[in-house]
Amino acid sequence: MNFLNFSILIFAYLLGSINSAIIVCYIFRLPSPRSVGSGNPGMTNVLRIGGKVPAAITLIFDILKGLVPVVIAKVLTGNEFITACTALYAILGHIFPIFFGFKGGKGVATLIGTLFGFSWILGLIFVITWLCVAIITRYSSLSALVATVIASFSVIFTSDLQVAAPFLIIAIIILVKHKGNIQRLISRQESKIGDKAKAKNDSN
């Protein structure tokens, strides 16, 4: 690995480590997303806490955290594997941010950015899948899980296994981070889109 590739990976991780939800809530003088609602510093929890505008800003910045480094890697290296690894590092930064005690979000919005940066088709697959599941079930977490699995495994059909491997790792990490959501989905206790935030519970 040369210096350029190494620098891009470090940049992706550091950019991913900037938690948009915490910063946006601070700017809008909202409660910390880590202390109310699900306790997860992500877009969905910001939506419950502060409404559409703060949530939209959070979503945009989280997507850009994945999109920007992946596009940079794609343009500067022309190497699909390095580009896929850049996506993984951006996700790792979001989920395990060095600036916030390695306790971050669940990586879904940042994954959207990495997918669009890697291939707009993969990004479109994610968005369409998410919308379909969300419209039918109104569960944001279920929509994210289904879209993550389908979009990540779709990389296998557009690239070789080595390139797909970082995205498969991303899918596994995101599934593990949603363990609490999966348990609540099974017990029918998961919050639906539009539910208001409550005091922090055991969700992450």
Swiss-Prot record:
Its main subcellular localisation, reduced to a broad class, is membrane
- Catalysed reaction(s)? an acyl phosphate + sn-glycerol 3-phosphate = a 1-acyl-sn-glycero-3-phosphate + phosphate
One GO biological process this protein is involved in is:
phospholipid biosynthetic process
Its Gene Ontology cellular component terms are:
plasma membrane
Q: Which GO terms describe its molecular function?
A: acyl-phosphate glycerol-3-phosphate acyltransferase activity
Report quaternary structure and partners. Probably interacts with PlsX.
Record-given protein name = Glycerol-3-phosphate acyltransferase
Q: Gene encoding this chain?
A: plsY
